[in-house]
Amino acid sequence: QKLCERPSGTWSGVCGNNNACKN
């Protein structure tokens, strides 16, 4: 799984099958 990038520029959570960010 790869990290998700938030609009603020920080990385948090993981990307699911639909690239959805889960905190």
Swiss-Prot record:
Source organism superkingdom: Eukaryota
Modified residues (Pyrrolidone carboxylic acid): 1
Repeat listed as a keyword: no
GO biological process: defense response to fungus; killing of cells of another organism
Keywords, in A-Z order: Antimicrobial, Fungicide, Plant defense, Pyrrolidone carboxylic acid
Keyword ATP-binding: no
Record function comment: Possesses antifungal activity sensitive to inorganic cations.
Subunit structure: Forms oligomers in its native state.
Family in the record: Belongs to the DEFL family.
Protein name in the entry: Defensin-like protein 2
